[in-house]
Amino acid sequence: AILRVGIDTGETLAVNNGRNGNREPLFLGDAANHAAKLASNLSTKGIYLTNAARLAIGLKEVDTPAKTALTKEEIKDCQDAADLDVTAETIVKEWREDQKNNPLGGFVFTRHTPPFSTMDIPALTPGNSRRQEAVSIYADIDGFTAYVADNIEENAENVVRVLHVLRAELERVLTTEFKGRRIRFIGDCVHGLICEGTAATTEVQDTISEATRLAGAFRSSFDLAIEKLEKKKYFSGEMGLAIGFDYGPM
């Protein structure tokens, strides 16, 4: 396994993301986006800082932040400055003790009877897991990061409002109209699953056909939501929706 960390600093919006017991914090803004890109840009391990973050802690700018990891000396300086009362060795030791005292046990996979909208994901355990063929679909709001950057200082309330409206609409289309299952929100992207068939068999053609219809419904609902937000003067600008899906074992 390779651990790669990306860090940036700047003004961000912190929002409570999700509904119905599936809440998690989400940070909006250039800093969050740049940090994520640094973390996922390449496969080499290490801690990578943008030039803004490097300057904030007194380091010099570099020509290629995505290829310049912190040195051991720079990491030690950060540790000394932070004066943390915990070490990596302590965390690993406690983790191993927890694994010993609370073993995961064996994994048991069964199939879920469609529609996936009835799947209670929080109730799943290693011994009560699901595995079957289905479509995994992503709908990503294109241009939202630029919209946040343009409005974070003067219009932060509408940024959060637009995000919640658009994602709620996408989730409603997925779960209510097409009986799919939202897996999670990833920033301004929604990830879901959809399956047609029975507990014993996935109907491949029907599943892919419904996923294609779902992609069209995503776009139609997104365009309508943007139109209504513009009429209410909550939004002005350019945003689009990028959709991709694939079929296989989940």
Regions found by a protein language model. Name each.
Residues R23, S43-S136, G143:
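Intrinsically disordered, glycine/charged-rich C-terminal tails and inter-domain linkers
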Residues V15-N16, I57-G58, T145-V148:
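Short helix/loop capping segments that flank catalytic or ligand/cofactor-binding pockets
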Residues A1, A123-R213:
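Catalytic NTP-binding/metal-coordinating core of nucleotidyl cyclase/transferase enzymes
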Residues L26-N33, Y48, V165, R213, ...:
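Charged, alpha-helix-enriched surfaces in structured cytosolic catalytic cores
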Residues A1-L28, L174, F178-D206, A225-M250:
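Catalytic core of nucleotidyl cyclases, primarily class III adenylyl/guanylyl cyclases
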Residues T9, D30-A53, D246:
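Catalytic/regulatory signature loops of cyclic-dinucleotide turnover enzymes
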